[in-house]
């Protein structure tokens, strides 16, 4: 087969596609959910132990007792994953910690195993089961700890520099200059103090020492020293500075040098209070390291080998890349150009400070010699900041004014890191442990030291509570999107910049949300939500991974420096490493030996796209799809779509509903198999072997060593989104299977591939205006043949509780309900499985005791005779809500006797699952993969649809107007190639950025015997006449989305009212009304529709008495009475009175109108026996009239 026609690629064992890719894949996609699983594994293996080592040993205040950590272990989980789902429990394992209590007075050691609560475990699919629901912990993108330099122009055009030292936790340190060029420091966002005072406080008091240490005679430092004068001669300079700092940090408290020393030590030099984390130490050492800072500067001294005296760099020599390669090993040594400074006794830190200093010429003033000071590579074990870090960062800050060094871009992915599950959990666990530590200390001082045991000291409540809080209510712990496998996979690979310690939606500006050049190969530039979260929630690119520091890395093929050939050696680079290299694109043509075909290639260097000689190329992309996320990589011809529409396409694929008969796309991208395989919905074999038994519920595989693996399939489960989760076997008895092979398809899968929709026949044409504005006209065949039919399962729950008046009861005996309504209930009053139910039907019969009323004499007599008190109960049965009818698929009953854990006060709980078969109907939302969405506007009988010359009717008609302005031409290419694939009976793969070209599509059409322009004559099904022009007809993958009209349609009859305003509630869930808002009122006012407006604002809204009276009048056929005062007006009056205003309502004659309180109208509101009351009033009225009549007659007689 020639290259033009593509080549065959096998995906799994059941699907072969003709692939049009031209670029050889050198690296397989990684496991797509390893972001989750690897991080959690790290937490269990290392993170937990780290936490215990950090907090322990815990010593009491006198130092008599200490509690040490020995080891921990997780025991077997109480429930399996499936049982946890059914019991609404957590899938978790008990954590046991071995602790050792040492009594320093007696030398006695007690070891004990302490239970530390149940710890949620991650399932194989990378999710957690919390209270029976699957949840995902989304990774968080935060600013990395480290030292950052920034610059901004002031109003006079001067560049002001600023520096921020950000720890993982602890106080921030900021340096800045003011308009007069005086340098200041802020500690933890407090008021600023001259920068030199901080150095004095560290124990270097004199001006000369400061100039020597900072190695700078810059104007800014000199001005700062002038500003920082010795005010109180009784104190030394060090003590004075300490007191000044204390005054800023604790204003109003008596200041002493000692208290200031202990405060600063606690703020910056205590590892428990100040933590840079390994990543912060790594970033600070990297930024302050002389290797990067000396590049391209001219040295002002000769640098020689300290051992041999051999000259490495001559004075006045420029340090370029070659010189630096020679110098770098020396700079890494402890004895090369290092100087030690000893602080005075009065300083905060007593240890001497070692700095690495090299003299260079200032780039701004070549005569001026400036010191470049490094922190001498502080050891990685120092979690807190050191004086050397402070001094080196100040030196960098002053050197920026000399034109040395660079400022940082905070949106660069080298300065943002991810916190994945493991780290988020670890932080939460730390909070719990530190709360526990406080309790342990207190208990140590209270309890008898001779008899106390570790168990008595430990209170695990704070630990358990913090873990529970994290999984239950953290912003990053989310209810898993289980609409389809792609949604599930994308959710696990998501990054959020929101959440605790992150940004907030309102504060996030344009820059943070924007696509940055460092996103290339790390974060998808396409897949992000539309709306307020745009750019704050992102998706991991397909090949990216996260390194131990939390930075996102992407793979590149190394280019050999000697031969300039591309090797198969793969290096993973973080964003700041990548900045040093020139990287060629994946589609640069290569010869068979790996050398570049052309002498010049397109490449990237930082944020530039450059045409560059191949000799200067360091790396090459591994694949064209490494730029995008998995969902985006599922869009064929992505390169022909506008990015805004591609964004919609990527997002809408995640909302596709799993159909009854799914079909994989005829035109795929080749990633469908991998996406479905890794999503966790397919059944995957664990070992290789031979299939021995297959049915709908179980598959058995005989391993080569003779043992048997049994795999249970999930049948018709309800997924998180109420969709149907069902697995279907795709292997047969006798098949050989490999380890890690798909045995059974999950929802929205076919033959191991992702199958989110169908391949209907589509024409771009109009049809009587029915596809105006993105509407879709569909063939009735799609409804009749269940092409787009899906199953939805809803869960309904009823609890029988204990009430003050007695227990509720689940029963068939329901007051005032006819036998007909009970026909589908069993003897306990619970619906039968398989019964067909509609709105308002009883699912679970339940009665609740009513308050006992005073009995009449007759009733008391009856009770005395029959001995039984008439039970006063009301019907509180669970009924089918509006629009939720269907077939009862399952019923689960939970009781304490059955060993189920129920919440207090609940005696029994019944869950009913109702399955609905939803066919495609008018109002449903559909979409292609290119952001081409629309709603179904008309279902046309098959015989009326336009048909092709061979008589085949079209399935879907789309408006051609939806293509040009939206610039998603990919859908047209998808359509043509799909048509060719259908005719040829093949599946094709067109990978993103490396797919079928125009000529491939035309040759495929030719091969299939179709016209070269992909158009055909269509005939009108109603008249049989041909349409004037030929029409583009083809096969395009089309999805039905989760926004279905059945879930949205709603109408209120009689429903609930809001308590305070007495207005109807809003929304379908509350069975609410339609809001008639301010603007709608204007519309009626404009038309002068006074009476309509009046009834909308009174009877139909919150005139409580009026609406009852109106109801009575309608029932009796009498004229409707005048409206009363709306309740909201009464609320307004009450609010004003609450503010102390004496407000009265007067009529035209200045008489006060009595606003009766709601309590006075109680009977009316409740509407209890309103008709009886009304009848009684009528009778009284008639009686009065009759009396009056007789009285009048009497009067006339007497006259």
Swiss-Prot record:
**SUPFAM superfamilies hit by this protein:** beta and beta-prime subunits of DNA dependent RNA-polymerase
Q: Which InterPro entries match?
A: DNA-dir_RNA_pol_bsu_ext_1_sf, DNA-dir_RNA_pol_bsu_external_1, DNA-dir_RNA_pol_su2, DNA-dir_RNAP_su2_dom, DNA-dir_RNAP_su2_hyb_sf, RNA_pol_bsu_bac, RNA_pol_bsu_CS, RNA_pol_bsu_protrusion
Q: Which UniProt keywords apply?
A: DNA-directed RNA polymerase, Nucleotidyltransferase, Transcription, Transferase
Which catalytic reaction applies to this protein?
A: RNA(n) + a ribonucleoside 5'-triphosphate = RNA(n+1) + diphosphate
Enzyme Commission identifier(s): 2.7.7.6
Task: Extract one GO molecular function annotation from the record.
Answer: DNA-directed RNA polymerase activity
Query: What's an example Gene Ontology biological process for this entry?
Result: DNA-templated transcription
Give positions of region: Disordered: 1177-1199
Sorted alphabetically, the Gene Ontology cellular component annotations on this record are:
DNA-directed RNA polymerase complex
Which N-terminal stretch is annotated as signal sequence?
none
CDD domains assigned to the protein according to its UniProt record, in alphabetical order:
RNA_pol_B_RPB2
Per the entry, what this protein does is: DNA-dependent RNA polymerase catalyzes the transcription of DNA into RNA using the four ribonucleoside triphosphates as substrates.
As for family, the record states: Belongs to the RNA polymerase beta chain family.
Q: How does it assemble?
A: The RNAP catalytic core consists of 2 alpha, 1 beta, 1 beta' and 1 omega subunit. When a sigma factor is associated with the core the holoenzyme is formed, which can initiate transcription.
Q: What is the protein name for this chain?
A: DNA-directed RNA polymerase subunit beta
Give the species. Answer: Ligilactobacillus salivarius (strain UCC118)
């Amino acid at each position: 087969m020639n290259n033009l026609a593509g080549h065959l690629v096998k995906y799994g064992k059941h699907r072969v596609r003709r692939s049009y890719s031209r670029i050889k894949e050198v690296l397989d996609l990684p496991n797509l959910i390893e972001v989750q699983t690897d991080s959690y594994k790290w937490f269990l293996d290392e993170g937990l132990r780290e936490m215990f080592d950090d907090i322990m040993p815990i010593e009491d205040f006198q130092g008599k007792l200490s509690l040490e950590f020995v080891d921990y272990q997780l025991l077997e989980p109480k429930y399996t994953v499936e049982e946890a789902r059914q019991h609404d429990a957590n899938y978790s394992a008990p954590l046991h910690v071995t602790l050792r209590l040492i009594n320093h007075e007696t030398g006695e050691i007690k070891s004990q195993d302490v239970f530390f609560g149940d710890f949620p475990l991650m399932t194989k699919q990378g999710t957690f089961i919390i209270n029976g629901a699957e949840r995902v912990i989304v990774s968080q993108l935060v600013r990395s700890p480290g030292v950052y330099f920034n610059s901004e122009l002031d109003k006079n055009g001067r560049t002001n520099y600023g520096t921020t030292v950000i720890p993982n936790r602890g106080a921030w340190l900021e340096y800045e200059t003011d308009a007069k060029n005086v340098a200041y420091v802020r500690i933890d966002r407090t008021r600023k103090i001259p920068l030199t005072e901080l150095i004095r406080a560290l124990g270097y008091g004199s001006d000369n020492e400061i100039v020597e240490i900072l190695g700078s005679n810059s104007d800014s430092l000199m001005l700062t020293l002038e500003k920082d004068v010795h005010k109180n001669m009784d104190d030394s300079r060090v003590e004075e500075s300490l007191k000044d700092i204390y005054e800023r940090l604790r204003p109003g408290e008596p200041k002493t040098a000692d208290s200031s020393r202990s405060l600063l030590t606690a703020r910056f030099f205590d590892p428990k209070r100040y933590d840079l984390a390994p990543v912060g130490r790594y970033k600070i050492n990297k930024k302050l390291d002389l290797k990067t800072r000396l590049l391209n500067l001219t040295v002002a001294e000769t640098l020689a080998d300290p051992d041999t005296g051999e000259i490495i760099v001559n004075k006045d020599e420029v340090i370029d890349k070659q010189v630096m390669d020679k110098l770098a090993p020396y700079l890494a040594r402890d004895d090369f150009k290092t100087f030690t400074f000893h602080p005075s006794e009065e300083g905060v830190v007593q240890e001497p400070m070692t700095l690495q200093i090299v003299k260079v010429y200032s780039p701004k003033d070549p005569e001026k010699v400036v010191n470049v000071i490094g922190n001498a590579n502080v050891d990685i074990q120092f979690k807190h900041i050191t004086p050397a870090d402070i001094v080196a960062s100040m030196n960098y800050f002053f050197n920026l004014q000399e034109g040395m060094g660079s400022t940082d871009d905070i949106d660069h992915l080298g300065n943002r890191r991810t916190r994945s599950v493991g780290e988020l959990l670890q932080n939460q666990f730390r909070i719990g442990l530190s709360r526990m530590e406080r309790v342990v200390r207190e208990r140590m001082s209270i309890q008898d030291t001779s008899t106390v045991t570790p168990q008595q000291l430990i209170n695990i409540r704070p630990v358990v509570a913090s873990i529970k809080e994290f999984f239950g209510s953290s912003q990053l712990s989310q209810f898993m999107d289980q609409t389809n496998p792609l949604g599930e996979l994308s959710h696990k690979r998501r990054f959020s910049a929101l959440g605790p310690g992150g940004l907030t939606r309102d504060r996030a500006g344009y820059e943070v949300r924007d696509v940055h050049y460092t996103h290339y190969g790390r974060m998808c530039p396409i897949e992000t939500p539309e709306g307020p979260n745009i750019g704050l929630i992102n998706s991991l690119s397909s090949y990216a991974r996260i390194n131990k520091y939390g930075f996102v890395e992407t793979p590149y093929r190394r280019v050999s420096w000697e031969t300039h050939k591309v090797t198969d050696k793969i290096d993973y680079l973080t964003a700041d490493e990548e900045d040093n290299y020139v990287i060629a694109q994946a589609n640069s043509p290569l010869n068979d030996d790996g050398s570049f075909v052309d002498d010049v290639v397109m490449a990237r260097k930082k944020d530039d796209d450059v045409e560059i000689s191949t000799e200067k190329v360091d790396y090459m992309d591994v694949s064209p799809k490494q730029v995008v996320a998995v969902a985006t990589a599922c869009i064929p011809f992505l390169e022909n779509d506008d990015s805004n529409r591609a964004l919609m396409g990527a997002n809408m694929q995640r909302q596709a509903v799993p159909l009854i008969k799914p079909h994989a796309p005829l035109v795929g991208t080749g990633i469908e198999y991998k996406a479905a395989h890794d999503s966790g919905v397919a059944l995957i074999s664990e070992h290789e072997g031979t299939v021995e038994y297959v049915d709908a519920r179980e598959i058995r595989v005989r391993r080569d060593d003779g043992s048997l693996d049994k795999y249970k399939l999930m049948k018709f489960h309800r997924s998180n989104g109420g969709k149907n989760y069902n697995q279907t076997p795709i292997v047969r008895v006798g098949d050989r299977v490999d380890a890690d092979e798909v045995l059974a398809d999950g929802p929205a899968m076919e033959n191991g591939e992702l199958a989110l929709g169908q391949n209907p026949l589509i024409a771009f044409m109009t049809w009587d205006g029915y596809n105006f504005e993105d509407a879709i006209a569909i063939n009735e065949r799609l409804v009749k043949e269940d092409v787009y039919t899906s199953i939805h399962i809803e869960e309904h729950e009823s609890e029988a509780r204990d009430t003050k008046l007695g227990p509720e009861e689940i029963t068939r005996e329901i007051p005032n309900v006819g036998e007909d309504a009970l026909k589908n209930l069993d003897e306990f009053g619970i619906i039968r499985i398989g019964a067909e139910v509609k709105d308002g039907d009883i699912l679970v019969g339940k009665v609740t005791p009513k308050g006992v009323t005073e009995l009449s004499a007759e009733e008391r007599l009856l009770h005395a005779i029959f001995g039984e008190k008439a039970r006063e109960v009301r019907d509180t049965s669970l009924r089918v809500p509006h629009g939720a009818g269907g077939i009862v698929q399952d019923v689960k009953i939970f009781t304490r006797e059955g060993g189920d854990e129920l919440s207090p006060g609940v005696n029994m709980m019944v869950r009913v699952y109702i399955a609905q078969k939803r066919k495609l109907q008018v109002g449903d939302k559909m979409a292609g993969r290119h952001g081409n969405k629309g709603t179904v506007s008309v279902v046309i009988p098959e015989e009326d649809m336009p048909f092709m010359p061979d008589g085949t009717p079209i399935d879907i008609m789309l408006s051609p107007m939806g293509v040009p302005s939206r610039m998603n031409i990919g859908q047209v290419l998808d359509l043509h190639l799909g048509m060719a694939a259908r005719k040829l009976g093949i599946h094709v793969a067109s990978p993103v950025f490396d797919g079928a070209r125009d000529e491939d599509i035309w040759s495929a059409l030719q091969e299939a015997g179709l016209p070269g322009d992909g158009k055909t004559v269509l005939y009108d099904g109603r008249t049989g006449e041909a349409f004037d022009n030929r029409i583009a007809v083809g096969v395009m993958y089309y999805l039905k989305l989760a926004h279905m009209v059945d879930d949205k349609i709603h109408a209120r009859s009689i429903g609930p009212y809001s308590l305070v305003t007495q207005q109807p509630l809003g929304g379908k869930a509350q069975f609410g009304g339609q809001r008639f808002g301010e603007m709608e009122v204007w519309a009626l006012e404009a038309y002068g529709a006074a009476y309509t407006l009046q009834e909308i604002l009174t009877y139909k809204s919150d005139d409580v008495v009026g609406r009852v009276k109106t109801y009575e009048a309608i029932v009796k056929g009498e004229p409707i009475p005048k409206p009363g005062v709306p309740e909201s007006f009464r609320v307004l009056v009450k609010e004003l009175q609450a503010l102390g205003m004496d407000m009265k309502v007067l009529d035209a004659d200045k008489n006060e109108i009595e606003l009766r309180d709601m309590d006075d109208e109680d009977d009316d509101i409740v509407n209890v026996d309103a008709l009886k009351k009304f009848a009684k009033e009528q009778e009284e009225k008639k009686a009065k009239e009759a009396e009056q009549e007789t009285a009048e007659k009497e009067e006339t007689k007497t006259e």
